[in-house]
């Protein structure tokens, strides 16, 4: 019998109340599109609920790649800022858990893809900072038009960098965020921008695969980012 060598891809999860059947209870969950894209790319999705940070290294040792998913604001104290009046509630234990996962992944040189909050977490962990309320800079809510509604922004990409080498020079992307990168973290290079100047993607060229995007590729039909992550595990 041939062994199954499909790579295991960890997916960080939301913690929120959820309802199913007769139950309404706290749950660890993630939109199924994340898992669908990983599976289609040839990987096996592994959900990673919030855990003890001292378990992160053991978890990472069993994975072949990591996706840092979207979610709530990161605690401003983690990048040396006071909370903005428009900052939204953070989950300190999720910040701690995912920081530990990311640092263990970096130590192991595991391929990492950050999505929305995931890009912001990578930036903060590498010493960068965030704009806490993008409408103050962008002059509107085009990046997050309404609850439950994705905005669409046109972005310009550097085709000599990731993810532009995968997606091309210009593309419309779905987004839902009110924060964004301010100062880039150590080693990070911006590689995509919205028309209003918002950094929409960044990567660390010296790493095997360390890429973050501010938009939500899981709701697009183009699987290129997930395919590239899974390919990088080989």
Model regions and ranges:
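Hydrophobic, aromatic-enriched interface-forming segments
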Residues: 119-121
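Active-site-proximal beta-strand elements of phosphoester/diester hydrolases
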Residues: 210-215
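Conserved G/P- and acidic residue-centered "switch" motifs that form tight phosphate/ATP-binding loops
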Residues: 116
């Amino acid at each position: 019998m041939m062994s199954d060598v499909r790579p295991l891809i960890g997916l960080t999860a939301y913690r929120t109340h959820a309802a199913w059947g007769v139950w309404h209870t706290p749950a660890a969950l993630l939109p199924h599109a994340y898992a669908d894209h990983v599976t289609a790319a040839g990987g096996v999705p592994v959900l990673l609920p919030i855990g003890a940070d001292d378990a992160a290294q053991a978890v990472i040792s069993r994975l072949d790649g990591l996706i840092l998913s979207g979610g709530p604001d990161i605690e401003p104290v983690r990048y040396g800022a006071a909370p903005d009046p428009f900052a939204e509630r953070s989950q300190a234990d999720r910040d701690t858990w995912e920081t530990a996962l990311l640092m263990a992944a970096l130590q192991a040189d595991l391929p990492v893809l950050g999505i929305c909050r995931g890009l912001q977490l990578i930036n903060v962990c590498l010493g960068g900072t965030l704009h806490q309320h993008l409408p103050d800079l962008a002059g509107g809510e085009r990046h997050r038009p309404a609850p439950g509604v994705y905005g669409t922004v046109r972005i310009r990409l550097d085709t000599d960098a990731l993810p532009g080498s995968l997606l091309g020079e210009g593309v419309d992307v779905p987004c839902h965020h009110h924060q964004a990168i301010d100062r880039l973290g150590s080693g990070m290079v911006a590689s995509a921008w919205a028309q209003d100047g918002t950094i929409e993607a960044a990567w660390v060229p010296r790493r095997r695969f360390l890429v973050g995007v501010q938009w939500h590729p899981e709701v697009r039909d183009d699987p290129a980012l997930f395919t590239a992550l899974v390919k990088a595990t080989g």
